[in-house]
């Protein structure tokens, strides 16, 4: 990967959802069309990009409320984990598995599947200004893991985050969660 990506971010809804727009030239990849489609489309317009891809990190209601409208307005390709896609209220064009990549603006952006918060959330790996950025949905936050509903789910999420994130990436890797502030793996 190169450092061709620029990052734009907006927080929407009463749930304080982070929506991220990755810009490569005139193309945009939106991470989570959580809510307030007009604000998301305005963010893209102000950045001078057309949203050509949308990644839904996981199936929870607060991450998909603007999804149908954004997809309808943009014609973007919709990506989501194959484990969560059956419960996402919009057609998923590409179902992602562990080790897959999203091909966006000539870049291959790796995907990590994180099980536990939902059956299988999709995290996106990028390089922005020479620093690895992980867009993790609600699987990892500053200070700990995302919410789980059973001991088995907690263990799955802990193992996935440990093996697929902490064991693989340096401490200066930026974690960009679905809500709240970003952090680094070393913090």
PLM-predicted stretches and their roles:
Residues 118-187:
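Metallo-beta-lactamase
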Residues 10-11, 93, 113-115:
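Short Gly/Pro-enriched turn/cap motifs at secondary-structure boundaries
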Residues 33-35, 59, 84, 107, ...:
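Active-site metal-binding loops of divalent metal-dependent hydrolases
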Residues 22, 32, 58, 70, ...:
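Divalent metal-coordination and catalytic microenvironments
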